[in-house]
């Protein structure tokens, strides 16, 4: 009887350990990675620019063909000037989610908040075209004298239920949430130069904050070509709030577009299918209310 009881207890203990271990593996994202099957996932490119210097070497047709070649089903596009975004959207409206970037003419990342009439420019473009976000714009250094402008921009975004796409460090993000806790934000490049610890802290502090990981692929992939441990923690904990992106801010990025998408698929391949799918396209599907699938490839 004693041995039978011990065997029963031992069996229950083994079963519980297996269940707990399985749950931890799922929470940790350590169960079977998607591997090469990642190539069969559609990608939503959450950080595309179609700036004027690209228009001649890369026609709108060329851009959509590049997307097709890399199974990029859809892209979030902002441009300098906005006409670039609209050219792409008019050519392939089913493939492009347009954002409204403030930059045009002599208005750029370093002076856009100080240019008279910038608010009117944004309002007029919104009235003319179906933009689904404001950005990507830069806040290089926080200047609280811009508060009134940003309050109006936030109001503009909230009226249309769209996101701000913000290129900045953590403090401007905190400041924007301080102006209005209900503002919707996509953090461009997940902070770019910020440490993984700073990224984790900000994502933890603001549960509604999304981020694109453009230009972060080599931070995410460690020197051994596996996911960096600190980034893995971010990816698993905030898998519902991350999206990949290319950042075609210069023509060299267009030149290397296939390699950029491939590098993003490489780190996604290290993740469980459920996590990889979210970051590749399902989170964007949720944000922008679009059906994203490989059926879009070859269409406009």
Model-derived regions: residue spans:
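Mid-to-C-terminal alpha-helical segments outside catalytic/metal-binding sites
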Residues: 2-10, 26-44, 59-74, 78, ...
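Bacterial N-terminal signal peptides
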Residues: 11-23
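Active-site gating/metal-coordination segments in enzymes
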Residues: 28-37, 83-163, 210-218
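Acidic/histidine-rich, surface-exposed loop or edge segments in extracytoplasmic proteins
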Residues: 42-50, 158
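Active-site metal-binding loops of divalent metal-dependent hydrolases
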Residues: 48, 137, 190, 215, ...
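Acidic/histidine-rich helix-loop elements
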Residues: 48-59, 107-114, 219-223
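Active-site environment of divalent metal-dependent phosphoester hydrolases
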Residues: 51-53, 82-85, 105-107, 141-143, ...
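Catalytic pocket-lining loop regions of alpha/beta-barrel enzymes
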Residues: 100, 144-244, 272, 291, ...
